[in-house]
């Protein structure tokens, strides 16, 4: 469901369900940074996830890169045991991800060290088909996709990067260090 906001922007939420803000307050409201952070913090406290997976700060799409920074501004974020990141816009959307490979190649925004420490999760054929079909359901995102950008994420693996592991706190990766070494 696409919900028009009070400031002429849109937000996505499950069909027939309330937005997080309405769940928290009982009312809809303006989509401001303060409201978003309050809603996000409430959601994290209310549902207490064991793991969170969020777009990486090195993602070249501004709102994707900003999400991790917004999350880090919530009190509840630091209580989540494990945080993984992923990249969608890896530096050149026309070339990455490769359109003709079954596995991901290193995106331009990753140096060799970051790429070497990635977490790769193999997908079954059925999982690949589910991902492919799920991607096709985002018609508004596919309409201008002459390069099959979104479809190119349907591969034999999913890749993630470990940002924080409170269970093994020595495994904290410095993304600032990665960007400086690119």
Q: Language model features by range: what are they?
A:
Residues 2-182:
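Metal-dependent de-N-acetylase/amidase catalytic core
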């Amino acid at each position: 469901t696409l919900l028009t906001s009070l400031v002429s922007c849109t937000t996505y939420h499950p069909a027939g369900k309330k937005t997080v803000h309405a769940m928290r307050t009982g009312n809809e409201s303006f989509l401001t940074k303060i409201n978003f952070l309050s809603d996000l913090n409430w959601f994290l406290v209310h549902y207490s996830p064991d793991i969170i997976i969020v777009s990486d700060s090195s993602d070249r799409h501004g709102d994707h890169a900003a999400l991790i920074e917004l999350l880090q501004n919530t009190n509840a974020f630091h209580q989540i045991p494990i945080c993984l990141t992923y990249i969608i816009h890896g530096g050149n959307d026309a070339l990455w991800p490769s359109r003709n490979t079954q596995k991901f190649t290193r995106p331009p925004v990753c140096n060799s060290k970051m790429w070497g420490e990635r977490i790769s999760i193999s997908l079954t054929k059925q999982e690949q088909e589910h991902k492919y079909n799920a991607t096709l359901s985002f018609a508004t995102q596919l309409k201008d996709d002459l390069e099959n950008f979104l479809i190119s994420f349907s591969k034999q693996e999913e890749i993630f990067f470990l940002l924080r592991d409170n269970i093994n706190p020595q495994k904290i990766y410095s993304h600032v260090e990665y960007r400086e070494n690119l």
